[in-house]
Amino acid sequence: MDKKASRIRRATRARRKIAELCATRLVVHRTPRHTYAQVIAPNGSEVIAAASTVEKAIREQLGNTSNKAAAEAIGKLIAERAIEKGITNVAFDRSGFQYHGRVAALAESAREAGLKF
């Protein structure tokens, strides 16, 4: 089993547990160049809020989109957008990625901005 298949297996297991809770989830995905975050409805069919380093305003503001500072900015932005829509409690879905580096930075800044998980 390769690295990607292992990550997807971990993500599937975590998503199954989150689905049992019927909780709104904050999903994080990272690539070598960008970081993405989405708040997804409990039924999984609706994206309530989204933020990523692909957005032009974020790219211009940050310069480098693949570091912890960029992840912190995305965490703050996704929290603001979710709170705007009335979502304060979420389940954190790290998509099988290690809770370290950019994933942890995004989570901590989202917590500081007001999301509870």
UniProtKB/Swiss-Prot annotation:
Keywords, ordered alphabetically: Ribonucleoprotein, Ribosomal protein, RNA-binding, rRNA-binding
Give the domain of life. Bacteria
Q: Which gene encodes it?
A: rplR
Tell me what this protein is called: Large ribosomal subunit protein uL18
A GO cellular component annotation in the UniProt record: cytosolic large ribosomal subunit
Q: What does this protein do?
A: This is one of the proteins that bind and probably mediate the attachment of the 5S RNA into the large ribosomal subunit, where it forms part of the central protuberance.
| Subunit and interaction comment | Part of the 50S ribosomal subunit; part of the 5S rRNA/L5/L18/L25 subcomplex. Contacts the 5S and 23S rRNAs.
One short Pfam name that applies is Ribosomal_L18p
The record's InterPro entries line, in alphabetical order, gives: Ribosomal_uL18_bac-type, Ribosomal_uL18_bac/euk
Single biological process term from Gene Ontology: translation
Q: Which organism is it from?
A: Aliivibrio fischeri (strain MJ11)
**Matches recorded under NCBIfam families:** L18_bact
Under the GO molecular function aspect, what terms does this record hold? 5S rRNA binding; structural constituent of ribosome
Instruction: Say which family it is in.
Output: Belongs to the universal ribosomal protein uL18 family.
